[in-house]
Design a protein with these regions (language model features):
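Basic, glycine/lysine-rich polyanion-binding surfaces/domains
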Residues: 1-182
């Protein structure tokens, strides 16, 4: 699922990225980059993969497939990591989130566009090979995903969520409704 609606400004330059048709720029990449750095911007990033991993061995599975210590993440924390093969060759980069609202240990793994199927298959294969107790679910087609970035992001989102965003730092997350949707 994505927003899959044409941009309001039909002059947006479109591109195919990982099988997803999306706007790559509206005005200019330089102008948009500066706007996000100085204020805030929102992006439909539904083309990014969304894989959840939960269960007693979830952190162990992700820890063996990424370069960071996923088990060190507290609920509500995230980390940037590389995904490598057995020889240490980098396959992809990712952000791994330890979800805050889960009763059990649950992580959200975000592979790059078009890599979710390969990452999912790899997780399943290694889970079986290593005999780990973890549930792996590819949720890429289930949810739209919007990134809101920039220093004014809390102000932009503040009116549409009851979550206190002022206490969040880089690579931290909170669970809650945005514009009435969980």
């Amino acid at each position: 699922m994505s927003l899959r609606q044409p941009p309001i400004d039909h002059s947006a330059k479109q591109t195919d990225f990982g099988g997803w048709e999306m706007p790559v720029e509206f005005d200019s990449i330089r102008t948009e980059h500066a706007a996000v750095r100085d204020a805030a911007g929102k992006f439909d990033v539904s083309h990014m993969g969304q894989i959840t991993v939960s269960g007693p061995d979830a952190a162990r599975l992700l820890g063996r497939l990424t370069t960071n210590d996923v088990g060190s993440l507290d609920p509500g924390e995230a980390q940037y990591a590389a995904i490598t093969d057995k020889r240490g060759v980098m396959l992809d980069d990712t952000v791994v989130y330890n979800l805050p609202a889960s009763a059990d240990e649950e992580y959200l793994f975000i592979p790059n566009a078009g890599h979710d199927g390969a990452a999912y298959d790899r997780f399943l294969a290694h889970r079986e090979e290593w005999g780990l107790d973890a549930t792996v679910t590819n949720r890429t087609e289930e949810y739209a995903m919007i990134a809101v970035q920039g220093p004014d992001s809390p102000d932009l989102l503040g009116g549409i969520t009851p979550v206190d965003l002022d206490d969040l730092s880089r690579f931290e997350l909170a669970a809650g409704a945005v514009a009435g949707s969980e």
